[in-house]
């Protein structure tokens, strides 16, 4: 049998309102249906990319309360952030995987 990993990206680049609990619920539904990894970007409440990890950490905490999906944080996306700001999600212990676009 071929092994596969299903990764979900529950927040679109066009999403303008970020709700950590709603994202976690969506991730949980995906997990129940076979997803094993979630791809998240670090965004503020208005959907803009940000180096502030507080909402992302809150979102991951809610996800962890519901399921044991692998959390992969992206440093990518088109933004005005510096490379130093973009790599901030690589450091927290609650992040299991990263994608890094340089």
PLM feature segments, named:
Residues 25, 29, 54-62, 85-89:
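Alpha-helical scaffolding segments of alpha/beta enzyme cores, especially the outer helices
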Residues 23, 30, 41, 98:
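Conserved, mostly hydrophobic/aromatic
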Residues 80-102:
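Extended substrate/RNA-proximal surfaces in nucleic-acid metabolism proteins
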Residues 34-59:
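Glycine-rich, proline-tolerant flexible connector loops at the mouths of alpha/beta enzymes
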Residues 61-71:
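Active-site neighborhood of glycoside hydrolase catalytic domains
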Residues 7-25, 74-83:
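Active-site mouth loops of central-metabolism enzymes
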Residues 4-10, 38-40, 69-75, 96-100:
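Hydrophobic faces of well-ordered beta-strands that scaffold small-molecule active sites
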